[in-house]
């Protein structure tokens, strides 16, 4: 399944840590691309450094027009906006997964950093809430992606990884391959 994440808004110094966590969570739980509406060199470099060390293909892009991108994406895929004000994920996730299974469409997930423009709600095929209490967009994204992928992305392994962790009951099992 091809999954992309669109982070609407990014408030420079204030958001660089959380935006980095959004990108790393996206990568770790199955997304292939993170899209931002503005450049942040620190976030880009952090993401690229992780991908280089831990492997896999994960793209970082900055959009000129998020609305144009979403409109074009809708021609081929499904757009899901994660918001506290959407439909209950527990009531809608089965429908989302059925639609994706039937059509093998790519998925674009929209999450906000600041007040999300009304157009995001209107352009989305689904506006989903992950809980009705205040929490982080990283938490919402992680829960949604885990449900979407059925947990299969949590232990991904990449042939080009320089660093790999093997789950263990009692010890740290880390492999580091230099020069790879």
Curated annotation (Swiss-Prot):
Transmembrane helix in keyword set: no
GO cellular component: cytoplasm
Residue ranges the record marks as coiled coil: none
GO molecular function: tRNA (cytidine(56)-2'-O)-methyltransferase activity
Annotated compartments: Cytoplasm
UniProt EC number: 2.1.1.206
Catalytic activity field: cytidine(56) in tRNA + S-adenosyl-L-methionine = 2'-O-methylcytidine(56) in tRNA + S-adenosyl-L-homocysteine + H(+)
Residues that bind S-adenosyl-L-methionine: 82, 112-116, 130-137
Statement: the UniProt record of this protein carries the keyword Transferase: yes
InterPro entries: Alpha/beta_knot_MTases, tRNA_m1G_MTases_N, tRNA_mtfrase_aTrm56
Domain of life per record: Archaea
UniProt keyword list: Cytoplasm, Methyltransferase, S-adenosyl-L-methionine, Transferase, tRNA processing
One of the GO BP terms on file: tRNA nucleoside ribose methylation
Entry-linked NCBIfam families: PRK03958.1
Purpose of the protein: Specifically catalyzes the AdoMet-dependent 2'-O-ribose methylation of cytidine at position 56 in tRNAs.
Family note: Belongs to the aTrm56 family.
Assembly and interaction partners: Homodimer.
UniProt name for this protein: tRNA (cytidine(56)-2'-O)-methyltransferase
Species whose genome carries this gene: Methanococcus vannielii (strain ATCC 35089 / DSM 1224 / JCM 13029 / OCM 148 / SB)
Top-level taxonomy: Archaea, Methanobacteriati, Methanobacteriota, Methanomada group, Methanococci
């Amino acid at each position: 399944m091809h999954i992309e994440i669109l982070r609407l808004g990014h408030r420079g110094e204030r958001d660089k840590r959380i935006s980095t966590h959004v990108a790393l969570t996206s990568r770790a739980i199955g997304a292939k691309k993170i899209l931002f509406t503005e450049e942040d060199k620190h976030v880009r470099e952090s993401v690229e450094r992780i991908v280089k060390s831990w492997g896999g293909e994960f793209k970082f892009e900055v959009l000129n027009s998020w609305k144009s991108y979403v409109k074009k994406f809708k021609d081929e895929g499904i757009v899901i906006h994660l918001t506290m004000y959407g439909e209950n994920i527990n009531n809608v996730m089965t429908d989302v997964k059925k639609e994706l299974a039937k059509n093998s469409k790519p998925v674009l997930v929209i999450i906000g950093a600041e007040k999300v423009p009304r157009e995001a709600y209107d352009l989305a095929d689904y506006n989903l809430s992950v809980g009705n209490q205040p929490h982080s967009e990283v938490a919402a994204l992680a829960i949604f992606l885990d449900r979407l992928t059925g947990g299969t992305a949590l232990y991904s392994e990449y042939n080009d990884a320089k660093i790999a962790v093997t789950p263990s009951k009692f010890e740290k099992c880390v492999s580091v391959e230099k020069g790879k």
